[in-house]
Amino acid sequence: QDPDINWRHVDVMLIHEDEIEKEIFISHSCHHCEEPACMDVCPVGAYIKLENGIVQPLHDKCIGCGYCIVACPYGSITKGKDGKAQKCNLCAEKLERGEEPACVAGCPCDVLKLVDSDVSDSAGMEKEMPGFKRFFTKPNIRFYPRMKRNEFIH
């Protein structure tokens, strides 16, 4: 993977709360969708879905057509210097060693977590958040309920 590519992006979203328009920030990368559009449109099968849910690009198979880039509703795929599609693979090699993905380990605010979908449902995490668009791909992303100012989770 190309080290010059940023796999995470922070977007500003506008929400209306208590009749006031507010800005919130969401950090996202590949959502490792249940029904990944990138995988569906790839003419050479350069994506596979692993048992753990990771949508894994197969760099050697990629022909650089860019169909997956256009198909991803979250803009999570880009072309590398070699012209082939690249995306977050959730640091699959780190997970195999029992380590956290780089984004989770390096998050300065400790807000990114890697959790099993069964745990996320029982932990009160939500699939929806104001401003976040859930598309037909069924993204595997969950949100902690938004905290009001001066509320903290310990």
Predicted regions, residues:
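Non-ligating segments of multi-cofactor redox enzymes
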Residues: 1-154
